[in-house]
């Protein structure tokens, strides 16, 4: 069939428009590039490898290689659209420096901490790993080993790693990089609702009358979801978009109301809104009386710093998460000081603007969707901020109904599905269970066929504490998978790098590319990427999606799952468990950790015949390992409000939102008629709490740990840009994305640049007491900070901006604040 260029362009345009509208076009109008008859390309589905939106893409493979990707028109999340990163997914696996063999630091043919990297076999790599792990276990016990994982792990990878650490090695020292992005959201959910993850869903975008972005730049960080907000705003004139941030960015271009606030002052703004609702008789008393309780948080709780830090020592209630029941009148009194005058004074936002924002929440006829990500979570009072937003929605009853939604977005493809739901945090188990609860440990031990007392009750080292323990020589064997924490984490010079290079420690990094973290390691293991393996992710709206392996991996790279399971074969149970445990389970004597964890009659119950022919992990182990792990994991949540569908179902659909009960997904949790766990006649049932009520939690404004001073006179905020994802490990290896934004810059207000006698494009030194970086100045463009604040993205490995970030955390969630620290900028002559 011949087609003119004009007809070709029209057909493509029609197909794109139809996909957005959810329309199926006749075959004659489809995109010819996607026609397998013409190109012999094989197409299959997979969730996108990047952010937590959970877009589905169609992956085109040819001759054993990914050659094209496109938005999946059948996907309810993205409806055929992709963002700029998604359109270049086909290139992320083919960087010229892709790692294909294990690399070990060696000198004179033997391992040496100060040696150079040399290729070795997998057997040699695991031999040295096992030697180091066994020596550490014998000398110091299970608290001397640790693992740092990822919200990019597949569900099965995270589950296998957590099981290996907590059941096999009996160490809770496993944490994901989601500690740096979603931990405050988790604790906020648990404190208010007794159960994690959003009650709303993406359908709220088509139902809300007002959108409020609390410190989120969705236009660049969640661009596909931003198109849904844009469509709603432009097609419904009554809809309002509100954007709150410490600097101007692309999301302001759509905003009806923009608010530039002083760092940390979002606490005061949220408390003012609650006060406004009360003072203007906008409380939904029927909802509040039936469905909420009022509580007061302990205050002056410190900043998650080392115990000997003066700021930590000065705190009256360091790290206290205590909640005290109070009356509504006491709650009213607690927010009364936050008048519009006081909120304006603290935040720097005009009084009229604050009142306009409060009115939208207070109007009973306006359905409001609040949205946030890192701006709120990466905050030394991030848990409080999460709860202050819930307070506003609970006071007005604007929750868990279409368009009324406090919605915590996620930044990684499975921060929800793996880090949170699987429980790869140092204190968690699957399905919101925790290691400190003996009943929860008993459930896990029963499912995993462990003797009582196997799982340690004390939470392990969280991400920031892992760095400190490596630095101090307490944590000695450390395995990093699927993240680049040497570039992404805080306070690199003071804590992390010295810990990695501590002669007492042995650091292993699994990665497809030679990242900053890999280059600081002792052993680097090459990993399979994305569709080089089978897996599942869980996105921000509780949607679990699965995909099949579609191409072979490159060289000798292996999946993170393969690495964990193979490593487990290196240990006999006598080498990892004490005699008293073995006496309770003598059947495990002489068996390997692999036998105990994975050849347990559950994980290995599904025969290889059920797997696809292309499934390297399944064929290596001799059974359908992904299905076995998923089904064992799903046992934790079924019947407990975290129900997942059978594994095979996920390969036939574009994901399902849990809880999935009787084959039906759940759109709005806690709402009778939508959530199968909400009791009949309840209206709303916050069943995560024993009394079925949500907590409204009073918490004040408290200042950040550091503020600008005479020497360090500017605020520094770090973050991302549209074209790159996190540390740029994948996106900077895509030529088109690299060319679009090759280098990080420091975005400055022109007046601040003028004061320092620097011009756009000139190189400056950004410094504070923790380090310094050289970077070029940008005074125009997409990001426009106010005077007194600068913004630098962290994707550029040549500009390790996070060296400057203090490792202060929210004391409750242990999540780092990457959004505010003082710096100075000087011109480089």
Curated annotation (Swiss-Prot):
Binds 1 [4Fe-4S] cluster. Binds 1 molybdenum-bis(molybdopterin guanine dinucleotide) (Mo-bis-MGD) cofactor per subunit. PANTHER family: PERIPLASMIC NITRATE REDUCTASE, RESPIRATORY NITRATE REDUCTASE. It catalyses: 2 Fe(II)-[cytochrome] + nitrate + 2 H(+) = 2 Fe(III)-[cytochrome] + nitrite + H2O. Predicted to be exported by the Tat system. The position of the signal peptide cleavage has not been experimentally proven. This is Periplasmic nitrate reductase. PROSITE patterns: 4FE4S_MOW_BIS_MGD (PS51669), MOLYBDOPTERIN_PROK_1 (PS00551), TAT (PS51318). It is found in: Periplasm. Its main location: periplasm. One of its GO terms (biological process) is cellular respiration. The gene is napA. Belongs to the prokaryotic molybdopterin-containing oxidoreductase family. NasA/NapA/NarB subfamily. It is an enzyme of class 1 (oxidoreductase). One of its GO terms (cellular component) is membrane. Residues 41-97 form the 4Fe-4S Mo/W bis-MGD-type domain. Substrate binds at residue 794. It comes from Vibrio campbellii (strain ATCC BAA-1116).
């Amino acid at each position: 069939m011949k087609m003119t260029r004009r007809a070709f362009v029209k057909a493509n345009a029609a197909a794109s428009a139809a996909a957005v509208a959810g329309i199926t076009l006749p075959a004659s109008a489809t995109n010819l590039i996607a026609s397998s008859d013409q190109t012999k390309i094989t197409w299959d589905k997979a969730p996108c490898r990047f952010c937590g939106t959970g877009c589905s893409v169609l992956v085109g493979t040819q001759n054993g290689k990914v050659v094209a990707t496109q938005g999946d028109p059948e996907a309810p999340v993205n409806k055929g659209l992709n963002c700029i990163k998604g359109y270049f997914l086909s290139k992320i696996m083919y960087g010229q420096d892709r790692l294909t063999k294990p690399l070990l630091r060696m000198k004179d043919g033997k391992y040496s901490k100060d040696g150079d990297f040399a290729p070795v076999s997998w057997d040699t790599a695991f031999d040295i790993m096992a030697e180091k792990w066994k020596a550490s276990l014998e000398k110091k016990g299970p608290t001397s080993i640790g693992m740092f994982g990822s919200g990019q792990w597949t569900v099965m990878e995270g589950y296998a790693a957590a099981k290996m650490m907590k059941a096999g090695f009996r160490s809770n020292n496993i944490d994901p990089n989601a500690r740096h992005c979603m931990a405050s959201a988790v604790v906020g959910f648990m404190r208010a609702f007794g159960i994690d993850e959003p009650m709303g869903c993406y359908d709220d975008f088509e139902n809300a009358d007002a959108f409020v972005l609390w410190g989120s730049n969705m236009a660049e960080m969640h661009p596909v979801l931003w198109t849904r907000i844009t469509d709603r705003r432009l097609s419904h004139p009554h809809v309002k978009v509100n954007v709150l941030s410490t600097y101007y960015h692309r999301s302001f271009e759509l905003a009806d109301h923009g608010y530039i606030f002083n760092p940390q002052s979002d606490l005061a703004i949220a408390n003012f809104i609650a006060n406004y609702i009360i003072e203007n008789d906008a409380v939904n008393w029927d909802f509040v009386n039936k469905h909420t309780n009022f509580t007061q948080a302990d205050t002056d709780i410190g900043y998650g710093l080392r115990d000997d830090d003066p700021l930590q020592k000065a705190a009256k209630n360091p790290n206290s998460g205590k909640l005290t029941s109070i009356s509504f009148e006491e709650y009213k009194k607690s927010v009364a000081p936050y008048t519009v005058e006081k909120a304006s004074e603290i935040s720097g936002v005009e009084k009229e603007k604050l009142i306009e924002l409060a009115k939208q929440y207070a109007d009973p006829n306006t359905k409001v969707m609040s949205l946030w990500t890192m701006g709120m979570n990466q905050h030394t009072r991030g848990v409080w901020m999460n709860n202050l937003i819930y307070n506003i929605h609970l006071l007005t009853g604007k929750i868990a109904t279409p368009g009324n939604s406090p919605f915590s977005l996620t930044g990684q493809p499975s921060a929800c599905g793996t880090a949170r739901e699987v429980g790869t945090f140092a204190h968690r188990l699957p399905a919101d269970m925790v290691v400190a609860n003996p009943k929860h440990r008993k459930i896990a031990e029963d499912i995993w066929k462990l003797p009582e007392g196997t799982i340690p009750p004390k939470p392990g080292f969280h991400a920031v504490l892992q760095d400190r323990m490596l630095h101090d020589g307490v944590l000695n064997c450390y395995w990093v998978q699927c993240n680049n924490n040497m570039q992404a984490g805080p306070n690199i010079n003071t804590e992390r790098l010295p810990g990695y290079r501590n002669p007492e420690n042995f650091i292993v990094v699994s990665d497809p590319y030679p990242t900053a973290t890999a280059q600081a390691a002792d052993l680097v293991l090459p990993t399979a990427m994305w569709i080089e393996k089978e897996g599942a992710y869980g996105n921000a709206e509780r949607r679990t999606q699965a995909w099949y392996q579609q191409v072979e991996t490159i060289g000798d790279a292996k999946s993170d799952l393969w690495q964990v399971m193979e490593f487990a074969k290196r240990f006999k149970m006598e080498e990892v468990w004490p005699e008293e445990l073995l006496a309770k389970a003598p059947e495990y004597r002489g068996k390997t950790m692999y036998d105990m964890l994975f050849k347990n009659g559950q994980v290995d119950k599904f025969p290889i015949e059920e797997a696809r022919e292309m499934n390297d992990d399944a064929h290596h182990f001799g059974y359908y390992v992904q299905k076995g792990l998923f089904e064992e994991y799903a046992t934790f949540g079924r019947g407990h409000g975290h129900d997942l569908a059978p594994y095979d179902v996920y390969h036939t659909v574009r994901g399902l939102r849990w809880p999935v009960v009787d084959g039906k997904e759940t759109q709005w949790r806690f709402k009778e008629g939508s959530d199968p766990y909400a009791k009949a006649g309840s209206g709303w049932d916050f069943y995560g709490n024993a009394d079925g009520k949500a907590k409204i939690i009073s918490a004040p404004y408290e200042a950040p740990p550091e503020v600008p001073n005479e020497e360090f006179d500017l605020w520094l905020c770090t973050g991302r840009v549209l074209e790159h994802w996190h540390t740029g490990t994948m996106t900077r290896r895509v030529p088109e994305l690299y060319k679009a934004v090759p280098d990080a810059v420091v975005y400055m207000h022109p007046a601040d640049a003028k004061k320092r006698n620097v011009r756009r494009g000139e190189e400056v030194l950004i410094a504070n007491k923790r380090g310094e970086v050289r970077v070029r100045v940008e005074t125009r463009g997409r990001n426009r900070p106010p005077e007194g604040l600068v913004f630098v993205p962290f994707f550029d490995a040549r500009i390790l901006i996070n060296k400057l970030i203090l490792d202060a955390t929210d004391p409750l969630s242990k999540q780092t604040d990457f959004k505010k620290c003082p710096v100075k900028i000087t011109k480089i002559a």
